[in-house]
């Protein structure tokens, strides 16, 4: 069945900003007639200068705030605001709502992601390099109070203090490492790398609410676990793990959190494998439930950005896209950055019992590349109540590693409108628990129905680890160089509904279930959208019909963000 494309005329661009506080991004910026940057001003910076070029400002709530003017740059194509840095460290204010917000929607949506891609005279290479920027949408009685703030990680504070890069980011290495000619410096850098000293704590990937109410920003380095105040967005400090596992450098960027516990994976670069760990709500101590040894024989474990759980099992991916110590130590990145592609070594999926830590299945599967698992559940084919097969769904990029290099900022900024986005699908793993050597990887829904793009997914959290029906994710309306649509995928009926507006780049669609709902898709979907004209807005879609029910425009453009969480009002 063909996708349903919901394309609506753009609503009015007028809005009201109230109780606004603004702080400029750099402490050495001046005000008045002086420039806030000595670099040539691109159009979005000109807007920032007009609106945000003051240390403190209060804007009359009765007067509409001007939007970015349509920018005209002679001789060059304007860069989409999704790939531009925020122009101030923090902002807060009320947004004017167009449409009607459900009365039951009371709480806070937080979104994390890279929001600053330059420091001093250095421009970062990759989407994943940017310094963490939190965005808040507080829903209260049909009103939306919004804010954003840069996370005060050690990496960001050091960069701001010294006006240069000081820690290794995803594709970036400090100049001090690159230019050091001392023959013994390489040994020192290995020590700093494996001790975690030189790795970033720039927690720019996800944000989670722990079972005890604490809110934590995360990235793939363990030191990049940072607590924040979800009301003020202020940084509280490092999450101090009370265990001996912190000597390992990296972790999954996407732990799985419930009201009672948190599960995560810790890759082992020395003895390639994965530790499966669990932490109870209210505790800072992680317990090792079990360990999986990599089957490939490679020098590094497969990249594990995310994983999945069922009611009784943990699903551990072992991709042929593997961590490479050689590439980790490089001063200049390769097209695969800190990884290498080893399809000749095989691809695997492991299944571990949550209760015993026993590996109950370890199967070889076709090669795959995935950032994000969607969900997993157990199937009982014999009808005796005992699981015989694990179904695990993910956003799978057709074993095409080009997606990593397509996220270079110069590519994103220069290829807008060109159909260069690599294909992706919902990949469905079937993992037998009968001792079989092989599992299956299938396409769950025809990829053309969601534009052959599929990532940044969410589900109804009440169906975590259970059989489910609906996936909310970023799809595409081609031609495009990045997912530019929101998709609701019915994996049972194999149907897709898409939301798309020309020139828009939406971030992860986050599903919030209606309290007391009896249908899986009874709720709302929240996304923050970056506009081609330099603006941005929050959009709410009905979880069932996937029709727009409300939007609220920011008074400035927000860059693209990654992952979010929902914090219900007490």
Curated annotation (Swiss-Prot):
Summary of the knockout phenotype: Increased shoot branching. The phenotype of lbo max4 double-mutant plants is similar to the single mutant max4.
Transit peptide start and end: 1-56
Enzyme Commission number(s) from the entry: 1.13.11.69, 1.13.11.70
Tissue expression notes: Expressed in flowers, siliques, inflorescence stems, petiole and leaves, and at a much higher level in roots.
Listed GO CC annotations: chloroplast stroma
Major localization class: plastid
Cofactor, how bound (note): Binds 1 Fe(2+) ion per subunit.
Keywords: Chloroplast, Dioxygenase, Iron, Metal-binding, Oxidoreductase, Plastid, Transit peptide
Induction / repression: Up-regulated by auxin in the root and hypocotyl.
InterPro entries, sorted: Carotenoid_Oase
One of the GO BP terms on file: response to auxin
One Pfam family in the UniProt entry: RPE65
GO terms of molecular function: 9-cis-10'-apo-beta-carotenal cleavage oxygenase activity; all-trans-beta-apo-10'-carotenal cleavage oxygenase activity; metal ion binding; oxidoreductase activity, acting on single donors with incorporation of molecular oxygen, incorporation of two atoms of oxygen
Note: The branching phenotypes of the max1, ccd7/max3 and ccd8/max4 mutants can be rescued by exogenous treatment with the synthetic strigolactone analogs GR24 and 4BD. The ccd8/max4 mutant also responds to carlactone (CL) and methyl carlactonoate (MeCLA), but not the lbo ccd8/max4 double mutant.
Function as written in the Swiss-Prot or TrEMBL entry: Involved in strigolactones biosynthesis by cleaving the C(27) 9-cis-10'-apo-beta-carotenal produced by CCD7. Produces the C(19) carlactone and a C(8) hydroxyaldehyde. Also shows lower activity with all-trans-10'-apo-beta-carotenal producing a C(9) dialdehyde and the C(18) 13-apo-beta-carotenone.
Name of the protein described by the UniProt record: Carotenoid cleavage dioxygenase 8, chloroplastic
């Amino acid at each position: 069945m063909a996708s349903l494309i919901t394309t609506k005329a753009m609503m009015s661009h007028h809005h009201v900003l109230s109780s606004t506080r603004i702080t400029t991004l750099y402490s050495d910026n001046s005000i008045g007639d002086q420039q806030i940057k000595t670099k040539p001003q691109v159009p979005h910076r000109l807007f920032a200068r007009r609106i945000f070029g003051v240390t403190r400002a209060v804007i009359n709530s009765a007067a509409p705030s001007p939007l970015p003017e349509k920018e005209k740059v002679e001789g060059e194509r304007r860069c989409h605001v999704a790939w531009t840095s925020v122009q101030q460290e923090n902002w807060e204010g009320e947004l004017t709502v167009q449409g009607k917000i459900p009365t039951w929607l009371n709480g806070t949506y937080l979104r994390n992601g890279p929001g600053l891609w330059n420091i001093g005279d250095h421009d970062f290479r990759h989407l994943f390099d940017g310094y963490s920027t939190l965005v808040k949408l507080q829903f209260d009685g049909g009103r939306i109070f919004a804010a954003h703030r840069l996370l005060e990680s050690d990496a960001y504070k050091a960069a701001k203090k010294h006006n240069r890069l000081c820690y290794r980011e995803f594709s970036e290495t400090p100049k001090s490492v690159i230019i050091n000619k001392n023959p013994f410096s390489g040994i020192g850098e290995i020590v700093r790398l494996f001790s975690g000293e030189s790795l970033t704590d720039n927690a720019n990937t996800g944000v989670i609410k722990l079972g005890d109410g604490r809110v934590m920003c995360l990235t793939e380095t363990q030191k990049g676990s940072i607590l924040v105040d979800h009301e003020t967005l202020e940084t509280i400090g490092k999450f101090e793990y009370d265990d001996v596992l912190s000597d390992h450098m990296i972790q999954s960027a996407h732990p799985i959190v419930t009201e009672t516990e948190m599960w995560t994976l810790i890759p082992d670069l020395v003895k390639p494998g994965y530790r499966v760990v669990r932490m109870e709500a209210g505790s800072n101590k992680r317990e090792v439930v079990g360990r999986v040894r990599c089957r490939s024989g490679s020098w590094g474990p497969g990249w594990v950005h995310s994983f999945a759980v069922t009611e009784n099992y943990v699903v551990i991916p072992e991709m042929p896209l593997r961590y490479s110590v050689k590439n980790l130590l490089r001063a200049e990145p390769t097209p695969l950055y800190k990884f290498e592609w080893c399809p000749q070594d095989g691809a695997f999926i492991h299944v571990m019992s949550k209760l015993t830590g026993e590996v109950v299945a370890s199967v070889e599967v076709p090669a795959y590349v995935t950032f994000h698992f969607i969900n997993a559940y157990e199937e009982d084919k014999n009808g005796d109540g005992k699981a015989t097969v694990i179904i695990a769904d993910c956003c799978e990029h057709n074993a095409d590693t080009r997606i990593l290099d397509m996220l270079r900022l110069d590519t994103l900024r220069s290829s807008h409108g060109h159909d260069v986005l690599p294909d992706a699908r919902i990949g469905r793993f079937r993992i037998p628990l009968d001792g079989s050597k092989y599992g299956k990887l299938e396409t769950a829904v025809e990829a053309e129905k969601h534009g052959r793009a599929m990532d940044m997914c969410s589900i109804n959290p009440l169906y975590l680890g259970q059989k489910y029906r609906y996936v909310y994710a970023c799809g595409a309306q081609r031609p495009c160089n990045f997912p530019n649509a929101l998709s609701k995928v019915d994996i049972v009926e194999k149907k897709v509904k898409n939301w798309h507006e020309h020139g828009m780049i939406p971030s992860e669609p986050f599903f919030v279930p209606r309290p007391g709902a009896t249908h899986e898709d009874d709720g709302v979907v929240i996304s923050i959208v970056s506009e081609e004209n330099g603006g941005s807005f929050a959009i709410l879609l009905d979880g069932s019909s996937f029709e727009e029910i409300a939007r609220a425009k920011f008074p400035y453009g927000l860059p693209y963000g990654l992952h979010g969480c929902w914090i219900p009002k007490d």
